[in-house]
């Protein structure tokens, strides 16, 4: 595969504390890849703000110390959860205690899933989202084309209320300035040069839904819409244009596939390969090490392999 670099470089970030665990399970979450990403992301001394158009489980937010963050996702339910946890973490925990008390069985799960799909956005729906995340099969977040959450019950022996993680997330939002947006990636990238973010030095980190390594390896739909090869091409092109126009550092994560190499390599990304253990998969028995790419667009970056 062309344009692939390997090797480690010293981390650009000095951690004052161990990063908190995310309170949500998330397919492709970056907790296990954080050390690798910190080698590539600019440090908080180099940029003021980190922009994430695909915030997902928020592992990178929790594992870095920028002064400002623009965190966005196309999944409106996910963004609502983060807003409600930020604004009232204690109230969220109380709601979860009630849901979890008698909730670890398939009958209760189906009732709560139906309720989640029926009610409007609000604190109760966000609590149900966390409940479903902790009780569904492998923590998968999946919707059908009608926007209905349809993941089956996971049959776990015990479900865990992520109280410590929720409180840690809320405390992190108090230590920095965080803006949450429900937005597609195009609109999020436009925000980096407008309004309150226009005068800031920003870096962009993108963790889009991965292209599967095979036809049966997995899905790339977490909001009811599939993230296609064409979407990856548009993303790569827009990131390259933003970097060329504004000099903004850009880091992306992608699956280590031929098509990922083509898309991001042709857009000018320097590609670094590493292995990561997948913690969420369609089959619990098939969890294994997989190849992952980190792509970088950064001015003045030499070959650090």
Positions of the model-derived regions?
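Short, surface-exposed loop/helix-turn segments at secondary-structure junctions
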Residues: 218-226
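SAM-dependent nucleic-acid methyltransferase catalytic core
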Residues: 2-23, 28-33, 39-46, 89-206, ...
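Conserved S-adenosyl-L-methionine
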Residues: 40, 46-101
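Class I S-adenosyl-L-methionine
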Residues: 269-305
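Short His-Asn-centered micro-motif
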Residues: 53, 72, 181-184, 206-208, ...
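Conserved Class I SAM-dependent methyltransferase catalytic core
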Residues: 232-277
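Short, polar loop motifs at secondary-structure junctions
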Residues: 54-59, 165-167, 255-258
């Amino acid at each position: 595969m062309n344009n692939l670099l390997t090797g480690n470089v010293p981390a650009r970030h000095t951690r004052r504390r161990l990063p908190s665990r995310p309170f949500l399970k998330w397919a492709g979450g970056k907790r296990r890849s954080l050390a690798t990403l910190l080698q590539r992301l600019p440090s908080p001394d180099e940029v003021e703000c980190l922009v994430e158009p695909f915030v997902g489980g928020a592992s990178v937010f929790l594992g870095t110390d920028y002064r400002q963050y623009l965190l966005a996702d196309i999944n409106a339910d996910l963004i609502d959860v983060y807003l409600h946890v930020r604004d009232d973490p204690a109230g969220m925990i109380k709601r979860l205690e009630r849901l979890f008390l008698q909730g670890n069985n398939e009958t209760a799960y189906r009732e709560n899933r139906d309720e989640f799909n029926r009610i409007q956005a609000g604190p109760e729906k966000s609590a149900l989202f966390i409940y479903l995340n902790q009780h569904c099969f492998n923590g998968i977040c999946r919707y059908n084309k009608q926007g209905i959450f349809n993941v089956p019950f996971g049959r776990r022996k015990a479900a865990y209320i992520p109280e410590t993680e929720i409180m840690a997330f809320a405390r992190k939002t108090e230590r920095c300035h965080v803006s949450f947006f429900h937005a597609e990636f195009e609109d999020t990238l436009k925000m980096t040069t407008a309004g309150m973010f226009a005068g800031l030095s920003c870096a962009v980190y993108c963790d889009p839904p991965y292209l599967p390594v095979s036809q049966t390896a997995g899905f790339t739909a977490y909001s009811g819409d599939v993230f296609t090869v064409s979407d990856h091409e548009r993303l790569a092109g827009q990131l390259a244009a933003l970097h060329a126009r504004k000099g903004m550092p850009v880091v992306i994560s992608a699956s280590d596939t031929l098509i990922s190499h083509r898309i991001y390599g042709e857009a000018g990304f320097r590609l670094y390969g590493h292995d990561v253990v997948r913690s969420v998969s369609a089959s619990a028995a098939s969890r294994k090490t997989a190849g992952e790419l980190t792509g970088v667009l950064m001015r003045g970056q030499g070959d650090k392999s």
